[in-house]
């Protein structure tokens, strides 16, 4: 193993081992104390979960549910050890986190001896302030999750499952993982103000980058939220909107901090406060009086009535004494004073920023304030980012003022800047970029090594050329392909989401014998809060892929003909689509009418004979229905597709010789679109390969053992 690592890597690993050993030796006499801290964290977490946390989580889960929904929601343990093992795992993680700081502290001597102890020029109190800020922001994000997001999300998910005819019986493991994952996501997202401000202040990431790339940030926020939240728009918006607002606040805060840093010598907070002391005092008094009026003149009652109107259980409490009321008033006055001072300082910062921009940034030059000579003498950067409509507006304003020479000068300077931009763009197109050039060389070298400099049509070089040509021909039509895919996906998901899955469920149960239909005999449950929605997304994706394949075939058909892969004309796509759709629908009708009900009935009756309580997961139940309905149609389509491919020029011998590649491809597709189980993957792959074998048998008969294909093979003379 060591021979596989270079010398530098081996030295780094050895140094790490020595450092870890030195830390353990240095902390050896204090390991008992570290273990006690670990034990406190472990046992404290274990019993806190048992006595308080699970009940708190259950309360958060059902906070916004009405009585009918709440009565159907239950948290279950699938195995006897689920609860205790989950508590132990969480306790271990918390215990390690508790023990890590004291372990590092007691081993600091070894780290200092190896010069691995950080030497920060930042004062300890500043580090403590940053740490407290991080904790406060994390707590604020978690509070939003527990008191706003989770109650509405769980109520929505439970109602969605019940309306579809399922029972929300959440596994405690999956339920806890869902809560902890979203808790972590809210906690991390709440660090945006500190992260953006710190990066901008340290100039690691310029503030201008955060400001200019805000559209990319919004897309990233929604993408990040899609990984953690349910796939419905409501909960994604509830997650993304607060984070977007937090990004805007962070951007504002970063601007203040960066501008203050750049002009720190020209801003005097004390002088600003002294100059405007009367204004600050007035703001503090007004805010204090508003707090007093809120508590003394019906503000508490109005606020509580508003909270009750939106279904919230939270209430404002009136202070218990005059002393407490006075403290609230004084605190409100100081808060108003702080905000007033912050506003005045920010106003000074903005004035300074405008002054600096006006002096040093030619792109911010105000062209409307210049005369003819000023326009002609302005730097080219002042016109570089202007649009034509902006220049015409400036020229029109100059004409309205009677200055036609200035209007003509503006247009002339804009034309010059436009010509420079076009010349730069032409030069950029003529010279390939460094990354593109490297990619081309790397791809060419890779294919050349595999093909030994020759690109025969039947080796990997020939396949690479074919695939690259086909993909390139499809790129120009990618908008139509993606648009059609998304349309089918959204339509199917919307139908399932708005009650379609319940209609399918009820119709299918109506085809089962009466003995296996009562709820006490056959029950379908959701073990994960998002299980029903995830199944709807996967099923919609499969249908969208099937609906998009004919469109893809239509667009790539000319490229396939040009590469001599197929020989039929493009109108053949319609024949193919009709034949495959007929096979799919015929197999689906057969499976939905006879195969699926027979299989479900057999399984249920077998379980009833053993006196078992039958409870199926949503995913397992509906994937079973899918495989025994649409799966029959897909199996029927395999021989049909093979015959069609043979008529298009794919020879019988090629299909027979390439069965290994087909097997690997089907395994990969099964791994993506079926439940995460090796057994299920093989249960899908084996029938499809059996159908592939049937197709080979049919082609063997039709082509007389491969001697007479239904169409000339690829590469044959026309």
From Swiss-Prot:
Task: Give the residue spans that cross the bilayer.
Answer: 34-54, 84-104, 137-157, 178-198, 214-231, 234-254, 280-300, 325-345, 478-498, 539-559, 572-592, 621-641, 661-681, 682-702
Give the record's membrane topology. Multi-pass membrane protein
Positions of the UniProt region annotated as Disordered:
421-451
* Ranges annotated as biased composition (Acidic residues): 425-434
Q: Which GO terms describe its biological process?
A: intracellular protein transmembrane transport; protein transport by the Tat complex
Q: Which UniProt keywords apply?
A: Cell membrane, Membrane, Protein transport, Translocation, Transmembrane, Transmembrane helix, Transport
The source's superkingdom equals Archaea
A Pfam entry, by short name: TatC
Write down what this protein is called: Sec-independent protein translocase protein TatCt
Q: Where in or outside the cell is it found?
A: Cell membrane
Q: What does this protein do?
A: Part of the twin-arginine translocation (Tat) system that transports large folded proteins containing a characteristic twin-arginine motif in their signal peptide across membranes.
InterPro entries (UniProt xref): TatC
Disulphide bonds annotated for this chain are none
Subunit structure and binding partners? Forms a complex with TatA.
What other facts are recorded?
H.volcanii possesses two TatC translocases: TatCo and TatCt. Both paralogs are structurally atypical and may represent adaptation to the extensive utilization of the Tat pathway in haloarchaea.
């Amino acid at each position: 193993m060591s021979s596989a690592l270079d010398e530098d890597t081996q030295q780094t690993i050895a140094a790490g081992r020595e450092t870890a050993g030195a830390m353990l030796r240095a902390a050896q006499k204090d390991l008992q104390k570290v273990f006690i801290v670990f034990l406190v964290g472990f046992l404290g977490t274990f019993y806190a979960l048992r006595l308080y946390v699970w009940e708190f989580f259950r309360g958060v889960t059902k906070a916004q549910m009405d009585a009918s929904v709440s009565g159907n929601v239950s948290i279950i343990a699938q195995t006897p050890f689920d609860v205790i093992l989950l508590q132990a795992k969480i306790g271990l993680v918390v215990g390690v986190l508790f023990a890590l700081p004291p372990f590092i502290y007691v081993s600091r001597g070894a780290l200092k001896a190896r010069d691995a102890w950080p030497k920060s020029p930042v004062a300890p109190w500043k580090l403590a302030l940053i740490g407290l800020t991080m904790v406060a922001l994390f707590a604020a994000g978690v509070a939003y999750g527990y008191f706003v997001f989770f109650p509405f999300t769980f109520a929505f998910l439970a109602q969605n499952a019940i309306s579809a005819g399922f029972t929300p019986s959440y596994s405690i493991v999956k339920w806890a993982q869902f809560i902890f994952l979203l808790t972590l996501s809210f906690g991390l997202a709440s660090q945006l103000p500190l992260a953006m401000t710190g990066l901008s202040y340290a100039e690691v990431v310029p503030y201008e980058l955060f400001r200019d790339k805000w559209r990319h940030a919004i897309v990233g926020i929604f993408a990040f939220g899609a990984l953690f939240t349910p796939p419905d728009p409501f909960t994604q918006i509830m997650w993304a909107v607060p984070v977007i607002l937090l990004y805007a606040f962070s951007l504002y805060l970063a601007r203040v901090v960066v501008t203050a840093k750049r002009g720190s010598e020209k801003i005097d907070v004390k002088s600003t406060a002294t100059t405007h002391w009367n204004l600050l005092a007035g703001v503090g008094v007004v805010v204090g009086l508003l707090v007093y009026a809120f508590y003394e003149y019906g503000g508490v009652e109005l606020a509580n009535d508003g909270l009750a109107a939106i279904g919230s259980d939270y209430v404002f409490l009136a202070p218990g004494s005059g002393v407490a009321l006075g403290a609230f008033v004084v605190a409100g006055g100081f808060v108003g004073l702080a905000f007033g001072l912050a506003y005045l300082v920010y106003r000074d910062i903005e004035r300074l920023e405008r002054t600096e921009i006006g002096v040093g940034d030619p792109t911010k030059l105000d062209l409307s304030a210049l005369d003819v000579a000023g326009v002609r003498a302005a730097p080219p950067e002042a016109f570089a980012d202007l649009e034509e409509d902006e220049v015409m507006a400036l020229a029109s304003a100059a004409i309205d003022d009677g200055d036609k020479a200035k209007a003509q000068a503006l247009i002339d300077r804009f034309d010059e800047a436009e010509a420079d931009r076009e010349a730069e763009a032409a030069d950029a197109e003529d010279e390939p970029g460094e990354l593109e050039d490297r990619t081309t060389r790397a791809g060419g070298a890779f294919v050349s090594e595999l093909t030994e400099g020759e690109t025969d049509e039947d080796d990997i070089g020939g396949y690479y050329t074919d695939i690259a040509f086909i993909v390139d021909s499809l790129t120009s039509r990618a908008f139509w392909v993606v648009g059609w895919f998304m349309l089918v996906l959204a339509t199917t998901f919307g139908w399932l989401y708005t009650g379609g899955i319940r209609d399918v469920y009820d119709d299918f149960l109506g085809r089962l014998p009466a003995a296996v239909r009562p709820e006490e005999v056959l029950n379908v449950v959701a073990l994960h809060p998002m299980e029903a929605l995830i199944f709807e997304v996967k099923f919609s994706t499969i249908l969208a892929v099937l609906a998009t394949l004919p469109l893809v075939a239509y667009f790539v058909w000319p490229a396939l003909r040009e590469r001599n892969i197929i020989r039929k004309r493009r109108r053949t796509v319609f024949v193919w689509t009709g034949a495959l759709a007929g096979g799919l629908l015929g197999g689906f009708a057969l499976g939905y009418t006879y195969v699926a009900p027979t299989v479900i009935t057999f399984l249920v009756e077998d379980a009833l004979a053993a006196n078992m309580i039958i409870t199926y997961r949503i995913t397992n139940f509906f994937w079973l229905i899918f495989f025994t309905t649409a799966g029959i149609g897909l199996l029927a389509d395999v021989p049909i597709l093979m015959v069609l491919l043979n008529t298009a020029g794919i020879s019988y011998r090629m299909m027979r010789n390439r069965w290994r590649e087909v097997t690997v491809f089907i395994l990969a597709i099964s791994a993506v679109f079926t439940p995460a189980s090796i057994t299920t993957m093989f249960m899908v792959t084996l029938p499809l390969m059996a159908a592939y074998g049937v197709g080979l048998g049919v082609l063997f008969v039709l082509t007389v053992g491969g001697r007479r294909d239904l169409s000339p093979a690829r590469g044959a003379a026309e």
